[in-house]
Amino acid sequence: MSEKIYDVPAEWAKRAWVDQAKYKEMYARSISDPNGFWAEQAKRIDWMKAPTKIENVSFAPGNVSIKWFEDGVLNVAHNCIDRHLHKRANQTAIIWEGDDPSQSRHITYKELHDEVCRMANILRTRNVKKGDRVTIYLPMIPEAAYAMLACARIGAIHSVVFAGFSPDSLAQRINDCQSKVIITADEGLRGGKKVPLKANVDAALAKADGVDWVVVVKRTGGKIDMNPTRDLWYHEAAAMVTTECPVEHMHAEDPLFILYTSGSTGQPKGVLHTSAGYLVYAAMTHQYVFDYHDGDIYWCTADVGWVTGHSYILYGPLANGATTLMFEGVPNYPDNSRFWNVIDKHKVNTFYTAPTAIRALMQGGDEPVKKTSRASLRLLGSVGEPINPEAWEWYHRVVGEDRCPIVDTWWQTETGGILITPLPGATKLKPGSATQPFFGVVPEIVDADGKVLEGETTGNLCLTRAWPGMMRTVYGDHARFEQTYFSTYKGKYFTGDGCRRDADGYYWITGRVDDVINVSGHRMGTAEVESALVAHEKVSEAAVVGFPHDIKGQGIYAYVTLMAGVQPTEDLRKELVTWVRKEIGPIASPDQIQFAPGLPKTRSGKIMRRILRKIAEDEPGSLGDTSTLADPAVVDDLVKNRQNKKSA
């Protein structure tokens, strides 16, 4: 692990919202007087009725309940748009940068207001009411922001599904939350390639019930099928409605959105976030972590299909009256300079991306970066997975020219916002460390038995205190919420991540400790990939583990046992990769498939994943005790035929 320390640049300590002394003072208050601290933070948003009850939380077994600001009344869209209009009507709210470098648009707060009202009125005329669910399956185009904010405006609950997910995954998510309306596009554009979104929706709706309307945005003009009794063109419907739409009065704990995330079981979990606590926390973390000041141009490269896009493209920045950049494309199209050209074109000050992108661009060498200016950049950020020190150093030295601090942020879909992070004016940096907890966050490291580990140590990361941005439940399944997050270590939120704390009290996230793989910063449940493989007629059994991958952080390694009489071939290997892409989406494509006559199982039939992980990591010498296996000889075959063998 790198132990090089980067001091806070003097000018940052001077201009930042928070320096080291202020961090210590604010953190101490957030722990000693949480009610007073969060009551003060709640003033950063507009309320129709200000809250008098601040925190009402229980992590007790059988009684997990999380409520913040519960008697307050507000509207999230009002806070992201309307309240800025008197001062910022003509300020750019969203800079949209298309997949094609020649396409970009500036959308002012006034234009955003009008477009969101149009979208909200379209939904209202289709009988969408407060509490109804709307599934959004869109590319990174402005209409994705309009759709999310329109739902917030009228009190509908949005469920955004990443536009890379397959029809089956989409159908699963539509059915789980019983959406009434889908908002999609004819096609998406990504890296110059078209993505058949409307066709995917049509295929999904063959397996999903209860959808009354499909609103279709014309993105490419490609030929699609339209069902005249169900489908409507967005541009035609928008021409029929006004640009005024009153906001719904929402209670603080009314749901804002559902976002599905992979769990260690096959069924995706609908993570439910509510209105006030989420918004306060997203806005506050955006201000302090990115040291946002009026006039900054801020770019988070995530997709709105993930929580990072929800919190740090949309809700956090817009609540703060910021200018936020929304990017339709990919880092390497049309070439490896794309990110840096966009930074120069739009004079971006703050840049927040994933280690996967950094590692991929690092492989292309320094030249594509160095031929651009990047003079506007002041701050860099990293999100989605731990960043290895080598990639951190390259990001700092080459992209940031040794002058931009890096905020290496740790958080989850479930947490709503950033939990462990440097603050650029306060925290000395160590490459690869997420450093220290944000205000109100109390990390605790425990061993497998739940014993609290003090000082310099390694173990499982728990959180002992609630914070306003945390999820409230798994949609429709509170028992699963308790079981997943609060049953492993009673009275504590278990993150599922391993963690090391060093002698300076800095936190280093070491990766998942449950059956979840972090691929390119996105969580993929091993059970989900296994289920997809076993659904293939030639597959009898499958086991999936993660392995270290130079670009993605973790790759997907699948062990597949075939049906009797089926021969393993290279063609079948390719067919299975294609099959998984179709079942779940490209993000779940196995990097390695090893055909295995048998899997290592205990006598009770449990697959020993520890052994499979070591083989996938090409560490056959550290398999540990295999004597408890029903058939230890299985391991020899797996070791001999491993796909990741390093060349001698």
Curated annotation (Swiss-Prot):
Which Gene Ontology molecular function entries are recorded, alphabetically? acetate-CoA ligase activity; AMP binding; ATP binding; metal ion binding
EC id: 6.2.1.1
Q: Which reaction does it catalyse?
A: acetate + ATP + CoA = acetyl-CoA + AMP + diphosphate
Q: Where does Mg(2+) bind?
A: 534, 536, 539
Q: What keywords sit in the KW lines?
A: Acetylation, ATP-binding, Ligase, Magnesium, Metal-binding, Nucleotide-binding
Disulfide bridge partners, by residue number: none
Sites of N6-acetyllysine modification: 606
Post-translational modification summary for this protein = Acetylated. Deacetylation by the SIR2-homolog deacetylase activates the enzyme.
Tell me one GO biological process term.
acetyl-CoA biosynthetic process
InterPro entries (UniProt xref): Ac_CoA_lig, ACAS_N, AMP-bd_C, AMP-bd_C_sf, AMP-binding_CS, AMP-dep_synth/lig_dom, ANL_N_sf
- Residues annotated as binding ATP: 384-386, 408-413, 497, 512, 523
Q: Tell me what effect the entry lists for residue 269 to G.
A: Great decrease in activity
Task: Identify one Gene Ontology CC term for this UniProt entry.
Answer: cytosol
Its cofactor is:
Mg(2+)
**From what superkingdom does this record's organism come?**
Bacteria
Q: Does the keyword Cell cycle apply?
A: no
Q: Which residues bind CoA?
A: 190-193, 308, 332, 520, 581
Looking up Pfam families in the UniProt record yields:
ACAS_N, AMP-binding, AMP-binding_C
The role this protein plays is: Catalyzes the conversion of acetate into acetyl-CoA (AcCoA), an essential intermediate at the junction of anabolic and catabolic pathways. AcsA undergoes a two-step reaction. In the first half reaction, AcsA combines acetate with ATP to form acetyl-adenylate (AcAMP) intermediate. In the second half reaction, it can then transfer the acetyl group from AcAMP to the sulfhydryl group of CoA, forming the product AcCoA.
Which family does this protein fall into? Belongs to the ATP-dependent AMP-binding enzyme family.
Identify the NCBIfam families for this entry: Ac_CoA_lig_AcsA, PRK00174.1
Name recorded for this polypeptide: Acetyl-coenzyme A synthetase
| Species annotation | Bradyrhizobium diazoefficiens (strain JCM 10833 / BCRC 13528 / IAM 13628 / NBRC 14792 / USDA 110)
